[in-house]
Regions:
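Canonical helix-turn-helix DNA-binding module
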Residues: 52-84, 88
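Membrane-interacting alpha-helical segments
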Residues: 1-10, 57-68, 119
Length: 120
C-alpha cells in the first residue's frame, strides 16, 4: 500500500466487516513469536538449509526454541521438513509455496523496519 487512499479503503473495509480477521489472527499468533520471522527469512535466503546452519545464523537462539518454531511453521505449511534415512540423521528445511508467498509479504515489512531503524 503506497498511498493514503489505499490505507483509508482498507480501514473502511475492515470497519465494515468485509474481511474476516480470523485467518489473520491465526497466522499472527505464529509469526509474532520471537525468532519466527527471522527463521523464515533465513530459510528463504538459503533455499534449503539444515538445522545447525540455521542455529549459526543466530547468536542467542535456544535449540529447543528453534525446534519448536520449525515445528509450528511446518504445521502451518510454511516450512517443509525433509528427513533423510542416514546415520547421523540429516534434516533439511525449505519454504513451502505458502512460505514463499509469505516472504513476498514480509519483504516490505523488513524494508520498512530497516528504513525506520536507519532514521534513529
Amino acid at each position: 500500500m503506497n498511498n493514503d487512499n489505499e490505507v483509508t479503503n482498507l480501514r473502511d473495509v475492515l470497519k465494515e466487516g468485509k474481511i474476516c480477521l480470523c485467518p489473520v489472527k491465526g497466522i499472527i499468533n505464529v509469526l509474532s513469536k520471537k525468532w519466527t520471522l527471522l527463521i523464515i527469512v533465513v530459510i528463504g535466503n538459503h533455499g534449503t538449509i539444515r538445522f545447525n546452519k540455521i542455529m549459526k545464523q543466530f547468536e542467542a537462539i535456544n535449540p529447543k526454541i528453534l525446534t519448536d518454531r520449525l515445528k509450528e511453521l511446518e504445521k502451518e505449511n510454511l516450512v517443509i521438513r525433509k528427513a533423510f534415512a542416514e546415520v547421523p540423521l540429516r534434516v533439511e528445511y525449505s519454504l513451502s509455496n505458502d512460505g514463499k508467498e509469505l516472504i513476498d509479504a514480509i519483504i516490505p515489512l523488513m524494508e520498512w523496519a530497516t528504513k525506520k531503524d536507519a532514521k534513529k
